[in-house]
Amino acid sequence: MDSDPPLVRDVFPDLIAELADLLMAEGERFLAISVLDVRLVGECGCADDFCRSIRTADHPPGQPYGPGHRMVPLLPQHGMLNLDVVNGRIMYIEILNRPR
């Protein structure tokens, strides 16, 4: 039996709390609720020292998300946080220029 990847909230609780607050501030109530249940599928893998981005769903690297995709930019106090969302599902959390 395969086990599910860990919940991001269990690995990075402060990040998820911040994302939920920022999403509510942007009027993204559905995403603010759903971010609590995203899974840590994998790291970005780009090896850039300023990138801490994570994949929250399976998706072939380098392929476009296609129809239903939107990018949700957020306004954190430090660095950059953006979400790739497809048909309401958070696929990727872009985390750039943030302290470790």
Please provide the spans of the model-predicted regions.
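N-terminal domain-onset segments
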Residues: 1-69
